[in-house]
Amino acid sequence: MVTHENSNIDITGKSLQCLKPGAWLNDEVINVYLGLLKERERQEPQKFLRCHFFNTFFYKSLTRGGYNYKSVRRWTSQRKLGYCLLECDKIFVPIHKEVHWCLAVINKKDEKFQYLDSLRGRDPCVMPILVSFADM
């Protein structure tokens, strides 16, 4: 077990095996890394943009049965987050595509949406869903 002292973020050595060459990245490692990015921002807010990092389950829940904001509404409340999501400069949304991870970014600061895929894939469904979510 590895623990990040400042944030109470734990991860097992077994989960970290996915970082070896040729291994498949898992959701636990992605969620831990996103948590560490948020912790870094909290510790030094003057150095970083205000960001929100959704966990790896968010997009799947948002899109279950089509666009379904109700299924994630509680994840986005100011009470739950401790800050207003709409005041963030960037909102990061990890997306799992069967055996591949992509990242969508709602970049409010620059007023654009980004879809990042190391395999240069495209998903015409992602952007309309995120536009609907951003217009909440």
Regions found by a protein language model. Give the residues of each.
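Cysteine protease catalytic domains with a Cys-His-Asp triad
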Residues: 1-102, 106-112
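Catalytic Cys-His active-site segments of thiol-dependent hydrolases/isopeptidases
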Residues: 113-122
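E2/UBC-UEV (E2-variant) core
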Residues: 123-136
